[in-house]
Amino acid sequence: MDSRVLGALAALLAAAAAWVMRAAAEWLWWRPRRLERSLRSQGVDGNLYRFLNGDLKETVRLTKEARAQPISPPSHRFLHRINPLLLRAISHHGKFALTWIGPTPRVSIMDPELVREVLSNKFGHFAKPKAAPIVKLLATGLANYEGEKWVRHRRIINPAFHLEKLKRMLPAFFSCCSELIGRWESLVGCDESREVDVWPELQNLTGDVISRTAFGSSYAEGRRIFQLQSEQAELLIQAVQTVYIPGYRFLPTPKNIRRTKIDKEVRALLRSIIEKRENAMKMGDVHDDLLGLLMEYNLKESEHFNSKNIGMTTEDVIEECKLFYFAGQETTSVLLTWTMILLGMHPSWQDRAREEVSQVFGKNKPDFDGLSRLKTVTMILYEVLRLYPPIIFLTRRTYKPMMLGGITFPPEVQLALPIIFIHHDPEFWGEDAEEFNPDRFADGVSKASKNQMAFFPFGWGPRICIGQGFAMLEAKMGLSMILQRFSFELSPNYSHAPHTKITLQPQHGAQMVLHRL
């Protein structure tokens, strides 16, 4: 090869290498240092930036130490197990505490009024952080979209979660709960009592519910998707415990290969279900499950604007279905599990809830009107959501300079809204903030704390969780039917060890002793 060509190639490679090095230096050093100086100059104190890792290594170390031992005797003072680094940062640096997610600064916002300002997002200055490609393999959909795409998808999906539509899902809720009750009655048998780890049982229950309510007659395929998505979630948890390196997902490691294989299978299953449903709709066969409603309203949206480009594509529908699975299954299963655990810890409240269920339903099938009248059960569920919210924090990012609480946040700063820390804060909940006291919700959510924004387990504002009504209705149905058939207490084998694996879960299971009534 001509020496001039070789020289030109060498110069080109050198220029490319120099550009990569400059970009890496900017991303990993100069930008974090600029952002840190800007924040500290305005009084935001916190952890110093550590090259590349930020607080990751310290987070892993502290969390490993905190989770080594369960909480004995069981109590609701457990924030040190959930996020020991943030707890220490807030204790040392105040409620505007700076921590680091790799080279990205994260400032925690503990003031409910500032949380309200961020979540209301009136001027569009706060966006959701961009999801890493590896996260998108699990789910994107409505929860991750911004701007016009979010508006369009929310408008299409919203009618599927209206009250009248939720009422039609009660038979599916009842069928799944009946199967669970029947299985537990078989386990207890003639012994009258039996130890059961209710955590995997309730995961299966809510997985079955979302399979039936999302896909109806395609239930078997739906359950396979649930199993695959659960495995994808486990792989994601392992991945987020390491520093994110752009392009790493393309390396043919066993886990990367498995992630890609799961994603392809899930997409193929969903595409097959959607195509069958499209063909059925053309024949006039309409379904009332979530997929059917989603496709019906998507078609209406396209017809209203007289353009196929206005509605969702098949890929969009696939992403929304994946999100149904993650959000619909995870959040309700952990809510029901922690509710059983806390009612096992506090039997007087279990008795009060059972008495109310008995007064409203007797031994009859729970119906919508009766579920709506369950005041004590609702108070209990709210208090469980306060102490053990399924999602422990929300995040937003600035994409241009934004004033908040007297501080001008530069672009590309993450704002953490630590739901669980605010839910446990005595400043808003009183000295009994870390005690189980459903009576605080006796007069409703608005009067439960010193600031109404101190309780936001489903988020708040225009992006409040679209499925909160679905989750609460399912939880009321499940809990009511369990209380009708069983009393329960914590097993001696139960270890109280809340920890986070995307959602707040019992680390060692939820072993309960069930007594048939």
Swiss-Prot record:
It holds the Pfam family p450. InterPro entries: Cyt_P450, Cyt_P450_CS, Cyt_P450_E_grp-I, Cyt_P450_sf, Cytochrome_P450_Monooxygen. The keyword Membrane applies. Its main location: membrane. GO terms for cellular component: membrane. Mainly expressed in leaves and, at low levels, in roots, fruits and stems. The chain crosses the membrane at residues 5-25. Pathway: Steroid metabolism; cholesterol metabolism. It is an enzyme of class 1 (oxidoreductase). The keyword Protein biosynthesis does not apply. Signal peptide: none annotated. Its EC number is 1.14.14.-. Heme binds at C465. Gene3D superfamilies: Cytochrome P450 (1.10.630.10). It is a single-pass membrane protein. Disulfide bonds: none annotated. It is found in: Membrane. Keywords: Cholesterol metabolism, Heme, Iron, Lipid biosynthesis, Lipid metabolism, Membrane, Metal-binding, Monooxygenase, Oxidoreductase, Steroid biosynthesis, Steroid metabolism, Sterol metabolism, Transmembrane, Transmembrane helix. One of its GO terms (molecular function) is monooxygenase activity. It comes from the Eukaryota. GO terms for biological process: cholesterol metabolic process; saponin biosynthetic process; steroid biosynthetic process. Belongs to the cytochrome P450 family. Involved in the biosynthesis of spiroketal steroid and saponin natural products from cholesterol such as diosgenin and analogs (e.g. furostanol and spirostanol), plant defense compounds used as main precursors for the industrial production of steroid hormones. During the 5,6-spiroketalization of cholesterol, may catalyze the 27-monohydroxylation of furostanol-type steroid to an intermediate product that undergoes a stereospecific formation of the terminal heterocycle to yield diosgenin. This is Cytochrome P450 CYP72A616. It comes from Paris polyphylla (Daiswa polyphylla).
